[in-house]
Amino acid sequence: GLWEKIREKANELVSGIVEGVK
């Protein structure tokens, strides 16, 4: 559903931020 897609995108953003901090 819609929430799954939103959460998936949010996880990608968080992962990108974490990678940027490393």
From Swiss-Prot:
Keywords: Amidation, Amphibian defense peptide, Antibiotic, Antimicrobial, Secreted. Expressed by the skin parotoid and/or rostral glands. The keyword Acyltransferase does not apply. Its main location: secreted. The modification Lysine amide is found at residue 22. GO terms for biological process: defense response to bacterium. Belongs to the frog skin active peptide (FSAP) family. Caerin subfamily. Antibacterial peptide, that adopts an alpha helical conformation which can disrupt bacterial membranes. Each caerin displays a different antimicrobial specificity. This is Caerin-3.4. It comes from Ranoidea caerulea (Green tree frog). The lineage of its organism: Eukaryota, Metazoa, Chordata, Craniata, Vertebrata.
